[in-house]
Design a protein with these regions (language model features):
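Hydrophobic faces of well-ordered beta-strands that scaffold small-molecule active sites
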Residues: 106-108
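A short, active-site helix/loop in glycosyltransferases that binds the activated sugar's phosphate group
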Residues: 119, 126-127, 132-150
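Short, well-ordered alpha-helix to beta-strand connector turns
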Residues: 35, 83, 103, 132-134
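An amphipathic, basic-hydrophobic alpha-helix
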Residues: 61-85, 95, 120-121
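Short His-centered aromatic/hydrophobic patch
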Residues: 88-94, 110
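Alpha-helix capping/helix-boundary segments
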Residues: 46, 92-94, 142-144
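N-terminal strand-loop element at the rim of the active site
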Residues: 7-16, 23-66
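Extreme N-terminal starter segment of soluble prokaryotic enzymes
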Residues: 1-3
């Protein structure tokens, strides 16, 4: 089973400067029976990166937002590769774009308050996520309860 994990674009996946999401991803990947077929995608300038990492290059572009550039470059990287699962961490607003470019199953992880994240603030946003995401995983009961608030 081939799994692509997309980190938030500001998340460092490095030994010395890893953020909370990177630490979680790295620790859970070490325990996975699929660890040899997991690729982690992100954007970092740090050179001391962790295993199975593919850097998404970003260039300053006043005509394209960093998020759009990040997602477009990710799409190019996975275009000709076969992944069974796309795992997205803490970025619900990435999901609609990823649905347009890939039929691969999508799993969304929430590490923080969903009501403060673009793409899951409104009830309509959250209903859409429930309909277009194959699975949503919450790192705590608190974040799950926040997602389910009316």
């Amino acid at each position: 089973m081939n799994i692509a994990i997309l980190l938030p674009y500001k998340e460092n996946f490095s030994k010395n400067y890893a953020g909370a999401v990177s630490i979680f991803v790295n620790d859970t990947n070490k325990l996975s029976k699929f660890k040899r077929s997991i690729k982690v995608f992100g954007s970092t300038e740090n050179k001391n990166i962790l295993k199975n990492y593919i850097n998404i290059g970003l260039k300053k572009n006043i005509l394209l937002s960093t998020t759009n550039q990040y997602l477009n470059n990710f799409a190019k990287l996975i275009k000709n590769k076969k992944f069974d699962i796309l795992e997205i961490h803490n970025r619900p607003h990435y999901i609609p774009f990823l649905c347009k470019i890939s039929k691969t199953k999508k799993i969304l992880y929430f590490h923080n308050d969903p009501l403060k994240m673009q793409g899951s603030i409104s009830i309509k946003d959250r209903e859409t996520l429930l309909n277009i995401t194959d699975k949503i995983i919450f790192n705590s009961n608190w974040s799950k309860s926040r997602f389910l608030i009316n």
